[in-house]
Every structure is written in C-alpha cells, then in structure tokens.
Curated annotation (Swiss-Prot):
One of the GO BP terms on file: lactate metabolic process
Domain of life: Bacteria
Species in which this protein is naturally found: Bacillus subtilis (strain 168)
Molecular function per GO: oxidoreductase activity
Induction description: Is under the dual control of the transcriptional repressors LutR and SinR, which allows the lutABC operon to be induced during both growth in liquid culture and biofilm formation. Is induced by L-lactate, which relieves LutR repression.
Disulfide partners: none
Entry similarity comment: Belongs to the LutA/YkgE family.
GO cellular component, one term: cytosol
Function description: Is essential for L-lactate degradation and allows cells to grow with lactate as the sole carbon source. May also allow cells to utilize an alternative carbon source during biofilm formation, since it contributes to the formation of architecturally complex communities when lactate is present.
Name under which the protein is recorded: Lactate utilization protein A
Amino acid sequence: MKVSLFVTCLVDMFQTNVGKATVELLERLGCEVDFPEGQICCGQPAYNSGYVHDAKKAMKRMIETFQDSEYVVSPSGSCTTMFREYPHLFQDDPKWADKAKKLADKTYELTDFIVNVLGVEDVGATLHTKATLHTSCHMTRLLGVRKEPMKLLSHVKGLQFTELPGKHNCCGFGGTFSVKMAQISEQMVDEKVECVEETGAEVLIGADCGCLMNIGGRLGRKDKNVKVMHIAEVLNSR
C-alpha cells in the first residue's frame, strides 16, 4: 500500500522526530511511504484568522501536491481536519470541487489509518512507563477520531495508563488563539497541567503537536517532571 506523508508545519519545523517515527511505523506495517516535497501549510492558520483568499492559495497547492497519492496520512488530527474541510470550501468552484473531495476522501489521521484502513490494533510496541492521553479538540470533535488512539495504546506492552481528568477540555492552544487570547489560554493550559499531575503520569501522550508543545511548554515552565510524547513515537517504541 502506497502512502504519502502529510508532515504538517509543526512536525516539519519543530518535531521532526514525530515525522520520522510516523514513517518508520507505517513502513513496519507494510506501507510504502513517500514525501511529496511540494507540500506547504494546509492553510488552517490563515483560514481561521479570516484570510480566506490567502488560505485557498495554500489549499490549491496542497491539492495539486497530493493529487496522485493513493493515501495521504498525517500525524495530526487538526491538519487532517482541514483537508476534510476542503470540499466544503471549494464546493462552488467547478475547477477545484472534485479535486478537493478526492483529497479529503483519501486523507487520514495516523491512528485512524492504522486501525480503520490497515485493520491493525497491535503494532508490536513496548514502552514501560506510566502515561495519560490528551485528546485534541479538532481530532475528537471535528474529525470524529475518538476510540482509535486508545485501541492502539491498549496493546502497548508495559504501558500503565490512567485516564486524564477533563480529557475533553481544550488545552488552550487553538493555533492563533494562544497568541490573541494569551491570558485565557494560559489559564486553560494551567488547568490541563493540574489534571496531568493528578494522574501521576510520567508521560503525556497526544496526537497533535500543537497541543503537546503548549502543554509541554507549560509543564517545563512549572518544573514538572512529565515527558510529552506524540502517539507516533509511542507506537514506534520497541
């Protein structure tokens, strides 16, 4: 099965280890992975800030970049959600409507792809630690990927898991929200940090780098000894 990696901006710029883990994991599961070098931002930050015209320029670039891909897989529920929104945004554009739908239909968040396309729940991972899981807003509320991460994590050997209190609450990142509404964002992430502490976890797992950077940064500033790991890194642990 051929898979094109949609790496996302945050992974490409700040968390390249997540991209590497994603590729290694997919290859171990029998996928042939390529990386279309024409990919840029999915357009979400510009779109959410109201710059629809500018956002669509990026979206068209991404549609063209992945037009020949069999499957597109991303280690981000948030950015995958943006791809799934393309058909709605281009529905009145005869030139791009069909292309946008084709891209949306073949694009998957990593855990969704592993469980529901590859049909795998045990990837053979081992990680001896105490952990909890933060579920991102876009991934659960908009993309509808809720059970897949835990289906995979439940098979990780050595992983002692505790459910995160208030797991459905936003961490306060929200892309530009954390900049435009910094004080509110700070209060939200402080609440999330308190919930993480309650679990006694040594590792906080997440599926979106934006959330992990936000919560991880706050944990660091408060001198909390909790490591953050993307779920791709956990599932790639041997």
